[in-house]
Amino acid sequence: MPYLIPILYVIVSYTFFLLPGLFDQVVELQIISALLPFLMGVVNLIVVLTVGRKWSKKTLLNCTLIIKYGLIPFYLIGGCITISVTLAALFPLPLMVLFGLVTVVFLIFGYGILLGAAPYAIAYLIKSCKEGRHSKAVVILSGICQFLFSFDVFSMMILTIKEKHLVKTTIAVFAGVCLAILFILLYVLSIFV
């Protein structure tokens, strides 16, 4: 049961790109569907502040990993789109400047989704510090990383390995991310060569 909200958050985060297109005629539904990930972020915060206080450190870590690992493809694809659109906006053609606005919108939505994922990680960090598992310096540094793209995932990977929890899964996810980045770079290089 504690994993239902994190799984739902990941699903909502992926569908927020798709849902506004389903409601072509009703603007209110488009707005609500675009804001759904932010509303789910508030739900995450409420769940962590109420029920989540009673959960174990492992449960909070698992909830964090569901969200962080589940959103890796979202941020890889979104990052590629953002970089492509930003580079396209640099070309001196009419209306290409408007592409810069797309970059700003993607960054705002991406950061909003990042913020919505943070409550579980912060709760885990606080609980692990209280139990003496991690030092205050590590907890503060990891807490700051929860608000920075990519660093949030890598800091949780390091802490997960340090906890000796889901080590094989974490290594497999890290290898998958490295392979995905390598394929993206090779694809970009093949375009220019």
Regions found by a protein language model. Give the residues of each.
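Membrane-helix boundary/juxtamembrane motif in polytopic membrane proteins
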Residues: 63-67, 126-148, 167-170
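Alpha-helical transmembrane segments of polytopic membrane proteins
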Residues: 29-41, 103-114
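Membrane-interface alpha-helices
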Residues: 133, 156-180
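Alpha-helical transmembrane segments
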Residues: 1-16, 178
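Juxtamembrane boundary at the C-terminal end of a transmembrane helix
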Residues: 184-193
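Canonical alpha-helical transmembrane segments
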Residues: 39-56, 121
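Hydrophobic, aromatic-rich membrane-embedded alpha-helical segments
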Residues: 41, 139-159
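C-terminal halves and exits of single transmembrane alpha-helices
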Residues: 67-93, 110-119, 150-153
